[in-house]
């Protein structure tokens, strides 16, 4: 009996590993090259490309909480995930047939709507599972980082051989395969014992949850905006497009080992201490870029993304789920993701563009550093709130 349970645990973990690898392989193969496709193949202007690329974070602000509510209300997150994975892959496939700018805008909005459900619901299911079996979320999630890193090289090479259209075909095939795998993920369901509206309202009335949303905005906003501006920074200080690819590979690849040790560090040092450490290192990285160091040193500092993302994501997700009532956990994770991936990403991307137009790309990173350090400061406030609660003050 014990052996059977152990084998089942191994099989479920293998499914999770394969699932996360596929999802991030698809994302890593499409989005880093999408702007190149729109510019070089479709011949859209820089402004048009910028508008299309900025649609996703705006849509996510509204769509991610909606999918969380749907998942919690139906109590069928696995079915919701299978459906949205399939729709995301199909919409991505249709990109390859389009040449009109306005159709691209519509497709980008639809793609973002379905895609916005993938990571929050997947993470919620994974966290629910590892908490039940006393497992390690980081050892599962790191395969997403590996999938992204491998995809940057593999799909980039395929694009050179077969043309940039291949990014949509790979994206569609991989996400459909992930949809099939999602069927075998463990079920996550809770008995609804309060009205959902009351549950969501209770989340927004929790001072610690609201403060953590602000922290997520300040820390994750610059991290996601960096995906848009880092290539400009590299080329501005003398790097090449190949160098940009190497930098993204190093950054994404560095997340995996830190995700592997994240659970052990969280248990040893505590969630909030890990959040402070990862946010502080992220802030130092952005401030360091403000002084425009030599290119070789910039490449070396990409490993800081392992600290900032590889440690912050597991600790933040666990904190949100532990904080939220059981019946609205997916909603809580979705709101958290919408604030970081959506609102924070949009604000920092938009604000960064204004700063870039008036000053320089180095100044953009200086602003990112200041925002992140404010986020780090608020984590100290959150830690103090936790300590006061424990001491009964």
For each predicted feature, which ranges?
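Helix-loop boundary and gating motifs at the non-cytosolic
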Residues: 7-57, 209-247
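Conserved MFS/SLC helix-loop-helix module at the cytosolic interface between two early adjacent transmembrane helices
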Residues: 62-96
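Helix-to-loop junctions at the C-terminal end of transmembrane segments
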Residues: 62-75, 159-160, 257-270, 356-357
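Hydrophobic core of transmembrane alpha-helices in multi-pass small-molecule transporters
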Residues: 21, 91, 101-119, 217, ...
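Cytoplasmic helix-loop-helix junction between adjacent transmembrane helices
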Residues: 109-143
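Symmetry-related core transmembrane helices of the 12-TM Major Facilitator Superfamily/SLC fold
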Residues: 166-183, 363-382
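Structural signature of the two symmetry-related core transmembrane helices
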Residues: 79-93, 273-287, 369
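Juxtamembrane intracellular "pre-TM" segments in multi-pass secondary transporters
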Residues: 2-10, 182-216
């Amino acid at each position: 009996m014990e052996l059977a349970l152990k084998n089942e645990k191994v099989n479920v973990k293998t499914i999770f590993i394969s699932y996360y690898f596929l999802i991030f392989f698809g994302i890593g193969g499409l989005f880093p090259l999408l702007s190149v496709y729109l510019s070089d193949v479709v011949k859209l202007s820089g402004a048009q490309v910028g508008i299309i690329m900025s649609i996703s974070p705006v849509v996510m602000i509204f769509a991610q909480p909606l999918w969380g509510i749907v998942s919690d209300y139906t109590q069928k997150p696995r079915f919701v995930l299978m459906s949205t994975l399939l729709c995301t892959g199909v919409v991505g496939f249709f990109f390859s047939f389009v040449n009109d700018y306005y159709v691209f805008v519509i497709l980008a909005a639809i793609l973002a709507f379905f895609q916005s459900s993938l990571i929050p619901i997947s993470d919620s299911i994974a966290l629910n599972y590892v908490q039940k079996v006393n497992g390690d979320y980081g050892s599962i999630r790191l395969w997403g980082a590996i999938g992204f890193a491998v995809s940057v090289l593999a799909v980039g090479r395929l694009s050179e051989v077969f043309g940039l259209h291949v990014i949509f075909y790979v994206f569609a095939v991989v996400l459909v395969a992930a949809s099939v795998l999602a069927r075998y993920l463990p079920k996550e369901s809770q008995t609804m014992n309060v009205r959902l509206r009351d549950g969501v309202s209770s989340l927004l009335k929790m001072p610690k949850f609201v403060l953590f949303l602000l922290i997520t905005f300040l820390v994750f906003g610059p991290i996601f905006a960096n995906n848009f501006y880092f290539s400009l920074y590299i080329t501005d200080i003398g790097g090449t497009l190949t160098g940009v690819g190497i930098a993204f590979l190093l950054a994404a690849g560095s997340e995996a080992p830190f995700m592997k040790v994240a659970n052990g560090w969280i248990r040893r040092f505590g969630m909030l201490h890990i959040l402070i450490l990862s946010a502080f290192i992220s802030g130092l990285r952005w401030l360091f870029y403000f002084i425009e160091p030599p290119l070789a040193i910039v490449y070396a500092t990409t490993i800081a993304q392992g600290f900032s993302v590889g440690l912050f994501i597991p600790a933040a997700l666990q904190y949100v789920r532990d904080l939220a009532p059981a019946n609205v956990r997916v909603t809580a994770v979705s709101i958290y993701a919408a604030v970081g991936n959506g609102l924070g990403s949009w604000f920092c991307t938009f604000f960064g563009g204004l700063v870039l137009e008036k000053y320089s790309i180095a100044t953009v990173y200086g602003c990112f550093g200041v925002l992140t350090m404010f986020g780090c400061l608020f984590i100290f406030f959150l830690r103090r709130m936790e300590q006061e609660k424990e001491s009964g003050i």
